Swiss-Prot record:
Protein family: Belongs to the 2H phosphoesterase superfamily. YjcG family.
Domain of life: Bacteria
Listed Gene3D superfamilies: Cyclic phosphodiesterase
The organism of origin for this protein: Bacillus velezensis (strain DSM 23117 / BGSC 10A6 / LMG 26770 / FZB42)
Catalytic residues as annotated in Swiss-Prot or TrEMBL: 34 (proton donor), 115 (proton acceptor)
Assigned EC number: 3.1.-.-
Protein name (database record): Putative phosphoesterase RBAM_011910
């Protein structure tokens, strides 16, 4: 089964992201707006038990973190993804690194760039046009995230929560 690890931002930020995703992201119906902490990975039922155990420990050892969105940006020319850029805080980087160690060991496909996708799989012209419009807008959003989520992918391609982990162990 395929799994992933994400942070879900507040409803306010999700609503803003969805206002663009409805039109510019073909994955809109498959997963809510999120910040990917670890790329999707395959695991068996036995392996996922070890993963969950490790994630519980990671959550206990971590603290709630600040998510600060500062601008719209893009991964162009590598690919035509438009996103809300999150400041790469030490807490975010540390959480992502921990999610690539132990039972989750592996190498990320790309270096960690914290972001919330608002558009993808656009033609080059549409990408350029939409990004140009978004860059003219001010975006400044800050919130505290106190949990992360292990998701799994259903047969129809959509993602759902397998388990939620409170940062700081909920203490």
């Amino acid at each position: 089964m395929k799994y992933g690890i994400v942070l879900f931002p507040s409803k306010k930020l999700q609503d803003l992201a969805n206002s663009y995703r409805k039109r510019y992201d073909p994955s809109y119906a498959l997963i809510p707006p999120h910040l990917t902490v670890r790329d999707p990975f395959e695991a068996t039922e036995q392996e996922i038990e070890q993963v969950v155990s490790q994630l519980r420990q990671t959550a206990k050892e971590s603290h709630p973190l600040v998510l600060k969105i500062t601008k719209y940006s893009s991964f162009s020319p590598v690919n035509n993804v438009i996103y809300m850029k999150a400041e790469p805080t030490e807490e975010l980087k540390s959480l992502s690194e921990k999610c690539y160690s132990g039972a989750l060991s592996g190498e990320p496909e790309y270096s960690f760039v914290p972001h919330v996708t608002v558009g993808q799989k656009l033609s080059s012209d549409e990408h350029s046009d939409v990004l140009g419009q978004l860059k003219m807008q001010d975006i400044s959003h800050e919130e505290v995230i106190d949990r992360f989520h292990l998701l799994y992918q259903l047969d129809n391609g959509s993602w759902t929560v397998y388990e939620t982990f409170l940062l700081g162990g909920g203490e």
